[in-house]
Amino acid sequence: MRHLFTLALMGAMTGVLALAGASWADDAEMVSLESSADSRGWDGVGKLVLGDRGFCTGALIAPNLVLTAAHCLYDKTTGVQLRPEEIEFQAGFRNGRALAYRSVARAVAHPDYRNAAEDGLDRVIADVALLELSQPIRLPSLQPFETGAVPVEGDVVAVVSYAQYREEAPSIQETCDVLAGREDALILTCSVDFGSSGAPVFVVRDGVARIVSVISAKAEVDGHKVSLAVPLAGALATLEEALAASRQGS
């Protein structure tokens, strides 16, 4: 089973987030990045292979650091956190090959993440993790992504992800919308599925793609499929502190 849990938004959330008049009409179609030309600029997104437990999506934000969803670090059946060495980041994976393969040396979930929470909003909050690779990835064609400020309602974002039935190459949805949000969760019109957990959400300005959020879950609002994402601003500093503490404790 791919690590992306499905949930329905509860009345409490929809009461906070104004969805009236939201439209999916302007969303771009999902496009598969099957060639090196298609993937140029996006090879920092990779498949995160979780041993024999499936996969998630991750994104390089430094030569040795990968962002993903916190729930990807846990065995779905037992709830036990995977050992870092069980996880492999396959950067720019497409058509059976990656540009770089790296095992994971350390993995930290956001301290506020609660994997034991029931499916619902409590499980989305702080669903973000930071992985330290065993060796940095230093390739001219594979540059880490910058990060940026949290998007607001009405902003246009993009998502690059792997997923069930499209696991052989990443796909990009170049335009989807931020329907609504609060400081710990965003509702997006972006299309995601099992395996998309941890996928980076980008804002592209002046030709520069910056990661602003991480995909956590898929959901439905009034019969429309949506995705839930965790804002990155603030969370990243907390993750970096947790990773530093992990190094000191090892």
Indicate where each model-derived feature is located.
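Catalytic histidine site
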Residues: 41-88
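Conserved catalytic-core segment of clan PA serine endopeptidases
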Residues: 26-40, 74, 80-137
